[in-house]
């Protein structure tokens, strides 16, 4: 059995450190995707309240105030913010993949939520954030996000997990129809790295789609220089602008929609032909990103 499914990948700047504004933004984008006929919309990693880029700034004096604000503007699974987003998904009859910072007690986690068109939610925490991410986020136990839906089997992983053979291999063997590769966007301190992380992430997404033989949505955040109020702190030189590299890929790893400019905000939209009744064995996963 095959079905045509319109999907949307978000490329947008988060509402930094403002959970209320972030929820309003997510609901607005859900409504915009629905109005374009999408049945699934995917958001970047930790889109609420934004990825904590100050980790790259090597500014220890920022950590106290910003970290406290980050915790305060993270969401709880049973809180009113996620309930509002779930209600929007149900009202619009759309599936939503959302990366967010989950607050539990005095810790925060890099979490992925999959909300179906009835508003039912499944949440999974990133088990092993990168070394730098662990300066903010906790580690967790439990499986990655994988769920049967009316659109087929949907799975989600965050960011650097796509470079780990163990993390992606288990997902691929499950026979995903649609994979959500939730990237945070890409901007670094100038001179800190010669690696083009945006190119690496796109290569990793293509590799994953080919190995899993699944469709892949790769939402990313736009991170302008004003992100984290860097300019106000006299540090306007530390962040690059732009950084959005949202993609929608076919099982062959090729683009199904023309990518937006790196600093452009909006929705990338494409139609997928999903064969939900046919099992597609995954190919072996590698921990190297290949174009």
Residue ranges, per PLM feature:
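N-terminal glycine-/serine-/threonine-rich phosphate-binding loop
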Residues: 1-40
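Active-site-proximal beta-strand elements of phosphoester/diester hydrolases
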Residues: 4-14, 111, 123, 152-161, ...
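Cys-nucleophile CN-hydrolase/nitrilase-fold catalytic domain and related Cys-dependent amidase chemistry
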Residues: 19, 31-117, 186-203, 207-214
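CN hydrolase (nitrilase-like) catalytic-core segments centered on the catalytic cysteine
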Residues: 77-95, 159-266
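Short beta-strand scaffold segments in enzyme catalytic cores
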Residues: 98-100, 110-114, 145, 246-248, ...
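A short, polar/charged loop-to-alpha-helix boundary motif
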Residues: 125-140, 263-283
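Active-site glycine-rich loop that binds ribose-phosphate moieties when present
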Residues: 128-147, 160-166
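Cysteine/selenocysteine-centered motifs that mediate thiol-based redox chemistry or coordinate metal-sulfur cofactors
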Residues: 146-177, 181, 277-291
